[in-house]
Amino acid sequence: MELHSHLNAEHQTAFEHVIQHLKEKRIRITETRKAVVAYIIESDDHPSAEMIYLDLLPNYPNMSLATVYNNLKVLLEEGFVTELKRANDTTTYDEVMEHEHHN
């Protein structure tokens, strides 16, 4: 069962927008990439890569922490997330719903 199948309508629209944008940029869409995108969209707080990794690991046991970081890097480069540097040297991530298409 895929994580994003439980998104509410607003989150589903945002999810589809992100995935479509990545496809248009010829960025490979993997199940773990979709899971990270859905996680960020659904998150009410600002998760760290480690938090995302630990929460998704039970459903994606072959996923590595590096995979999460790589996916966050792509989402950051494409303008879908922002990095938030915390005082304790932790970096957390926040979704950007107002993403504009930049081609």
Where are these regions (language model features)?
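N-terminal leader segment of winged-helix/HTH proteins
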Residues: 1-26
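Short helix-coil-helix linker/hinge
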Residues: 29-31
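Pre-recognition alpha-helix immediately N-terminal to the DNA-recognition helix
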Residues: 34-39
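Short capping segments at the starts of secondary-structure elements
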Residues: 43-48
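A short acidic, leucine-rich amphipathic alpha-helix
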Residues: 51-57
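Short coil turns linking two alpha-helices in DNA-binding domains
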Residues: 64-65
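Basic amphipathic alpha-helical segments that dock to polyanions
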Residues: 68-78
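Non-DNA-binding regulatory cores of transcription-related proteins
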Residues: 77-103
